[in-house]
Structure formats: C-alpha cells, structure tokens
Amino acid sequence: MESQKKFARTFSFEFFPPNTPEGAEKLAQTAKQLAQLKPKFFSVTYGAGGSTRERTLRAVLDLRSAGYAAAPHISCVGSSRNDIRDILKEYQTHGIRHVVALRGDLPSGTAASGEFQYANELVAFIRSEFGSQFHIDVAAYPEYHPQARSAQDDLLSFKRKVEAGANSAITQYFYNTDCYFHFVDECEAMGLSLPIVPGIMPIGRFSQLARFSDACGAEIPRWIRKKLEGYGDDTASIRAFGLDVVTRLCDDLLAAGAPGLHFYTMNQAGLTTTIWQRLGL
C-alpha cells in the first residue's frame, strides 16, 4: 500500500444516465445534494454497446451546466474508431477533459463486433488521437474480472491498460479490504504507480445488491450475505447494517492509505451522504 499513500485523496460519485424527464430532475437534485460534499467529479455510466450514448452525453452536459466537473464513461466493444473519435471530439468541444475508458459489454444476445477488443486498445487509441488532452481512468478488479482466465491474466490486462496511458484507476466494489490491499501490492510488484481508488457500493436493498454482485463478480462475504438474508424485507435493518459495514470498510481503506473513494450512488444521495458524514470527511 505504500505507493498509494503518496497520491492526493480524491472523492467522486457515479451516476447512470436517466431515461425520463422525471429521472433527469431527480438526478439534478441528487447531484445538488452530493455537490455539497465537494467531490472532485461526478462520473456517468455508458450502457452496453453504447446504448445510452446520447443520454450519457445529455447527463454529462447537464452536470457541466450546473457547474460540476463530470467524467463520462466510454466503452469500446461494439464501436469503431470513428465512433470513439466522434464521441471524444464532442466531449472535447464541451470542455470535458476526463473520461473513464472501459471495454464494456454488448447487449445480451448480441455477437461481438467493432474494432476494439480490450480496454487497453481504447486507452492507446485515445492517446494516439488526442495525446494528453484527456485524463483517463480505467477499471481495476481486486477480486478479478469474472471473464478473466486467471488472476495473473487479469493483472496483466490491468498492466496493459496502465502502460497504454491510463492516469488512474477505479475499482469494482468489494467488501473485503484484503482483496484491495493484495491487488495494490501486486500492482506495486509489477512496477505500476498510479492512484487506484476503491469503488464503494452502499447497501440499501439486498436483492439488488445480490443481483449486481452475481453479474459483475463482486463477492459478498458470507457473514454479510447471511445477515442481510436474515433481515428479509426489513429495509430499515438492512440499511442500518449496511451503513455500519460500508462506513467501517471506508474507514479502514482510508486509514491504510487508499487515495480516495468512488461511490456507486445508484442516483441516490442518502446512503452516500450518511456514510460521508460518519467518516467525518
């Protein structure tokens, strides 16, 4: 963890692009609430196969017009070089200089296509086309990507993204600090030096969390899963327990030298704000 201690702490919040006017209004209110915590930026996700391209752009521009720093996600699978070039030029026109570069997923039932296969190819393309004009975040997987052939293959995949020109990384969420510490140590052993910011998923609804975790390969430790299952439909108890677990997780990460936190907010301000207040940030 020594390499992470030298980086300034950054805090950020992630949104998904709304698909209704009501959702857009709700996101505006959520952003206004979370902006009071003075994050470095808000990020906005990008749907499978670029399915939310226009909505992601609109959400990012709305955040910018409200005076907030925004970083759009860009996924490359299913896209051509011209597609990516056009997207980045559009963001550049609007003064956006920070992107989160991902491989991404194709919509269910769709065959692989496009001119990119891996995220490192996207990072390399951005650098070749735009030089250092964009700050590039990439994804990191302390518990390893669910499609990785092995732990070593996944580490090498991350290394290629860094060597292609990534500035920093945001991890998939996790609830076991040891996996993050071990991942950072392995990155240090490979000579990688960049901020690796832990991704944090507040716990609000167990069914939703279980579904997300099964899909993305994030492990819910057995003791946490059993406690949450035991609460059944008792939402208040789930939230109270989740706040305790995630606050402790964040506290331990920051105490060990993590260079900030990136919250997956699900377009909700409440849980993230409460965790923030409990941490005394």
Protein language model features and the residues they cover:
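N-terminal amphipathic alpha-helix/helix-capping segment at the start of soluble metabolic enzymes
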Residues: M1-F13, T20-P21, E25, R225-K226, ...
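Active-site-adjacent beta->alpha loops and helix N-cap segments on the catalytic face
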Residues: E2, E22-E25, G50-D62, S80-I87, ...
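Active-site mouth loops of central-metabolism enzymes
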Residues: T10-K26, A48, A70-N82, H135-D153, ...
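Conserved, mostly hydrophobic/aromatic
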Residues: E14, F42, Y91, K161, ...
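Short, acidic/polar
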Residues: P21-L34, T56, R81-K89, S150-R160, ...
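Active-site pocket-lining/capping segments in soluble small-molecule metabolic enzymes
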Residues: E22, G114-Y141, M190-L243, R248, ...
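Catalytic domains of carbohydrate-active enzymes, especially glycoside hydrolases
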Residues: K32-T45, E163
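Catalytic beta/alpha-barrel core
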Residues: F41-T52, I74-C76, V100-L102, N167-N176, ...
